Amino acid sequence: MTGIYIHVPFCAKKCPYCAFFSEQYGRKTVDNYVKAVIRNLQLYQVNDTVDTIYFGGGTPSLLTAGQISDILEACSKYLHLYQPEITFEFNPTGKRNTYLHDIHSAGVNRLSIGTQSFSDSQLKLLGRTHSVNDGIRTVETAFQVGFNNISCDLMLALPEQSELILHETLETLVKLPITHVSAYLLQIEEGTPFSQNQDLLARCLDDDQSADRYLQTVHFLEDAGIHQYEVSSFAKKGFESRHNLKYWKCVDYLGIGAGAHSCYMGKRFYVPEDVSQFCDGEHQTEIILSENPYDREERIMLGLRTVEGVPAEWVKSQKIPLFQKAGYLRIGENGNISLTAEGFAVSNAVISAMI
């Protein structure tokens, strides 16, 4: 089973913490971009069965519901679909009821809402244009129009994010009709406005405080029946992201759009971050990153991001006993090595030391 990722690299406003590729929204450019996406879906001639489609960005909700419908009609026409999970990233501002109803009718069956926080002061700090009330109303409206698989994004370890502020955000979150949470630690990326804001940098949490907020989130969600299955991913039973699991389990996925990455037919490649080139070309350009995309180190690195872990025989590191003693690793009855919640809190350091 193959997954399809459709990248929509347009934003109405760039968030000050974001280092991802995006361009300013323009109607004519977006119209041409959608046509290029459909053209590439036809040209790739994917022979394998496709069971997940993911619209990511950028801000996919800048596309009209009609454009989403056109893309999904092309997917149905040119791909071999089988009971697909179709995820759509949605920004909780502006259009809600009619738009959500229309994309649900078009076939979108999973919504990923960029709430980020349920604290107005923290949303303001992040430069977000929506309020707490906007986030709540978006989730509730999505549920009312028929979405029964709803994920919310949370950002952790924000400047001045106290235990109380995070607790209130988590309390608000779990009262909503959601099935999934993606929770990410704030990363200060070079070249972003955040990286140049000395006042903000002085208010950032240290590593220990960041780990505390992460573990607070893990334990709170677990108590609410939203279980961790990957370092940043939590779900009610049966609602794990089928698309994202492909990344961590080394299953083929094909990215369509400027800046999209793929691991497909034995190659890892990406499309240049150039909207004009993507729109003007008959077929999207592929830049090869690797022709051995799932080597041993890659499988270990990705597998250790999951609660399931990897077979112990894959890992030859002499640091296993040290990390076990520190409470970062465990070896299960099935013989798999996996990270504990405490290990996930420092996963980058632990995983890099293991491969």
Spans of model-derived segments:
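Short, amphipathic alpha-helical interaction segments positioned at domain boundaries
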Residues: 342-355
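A short, conserved structural fragment
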Residues: 325-334
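C-terminal scaffold of the Radical SAM
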Residues: 1, 19, 23-44, 49-314
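Local cysteine-cluster metal-coordination motifs and their immediate loop/turn environment
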Residues: 9-20
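Short amphipathic alpha-helical interaction segments
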Residues: 314-326
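Immediate flanking context of iron-sulfur cluster ligation sites
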Residues: 1-8
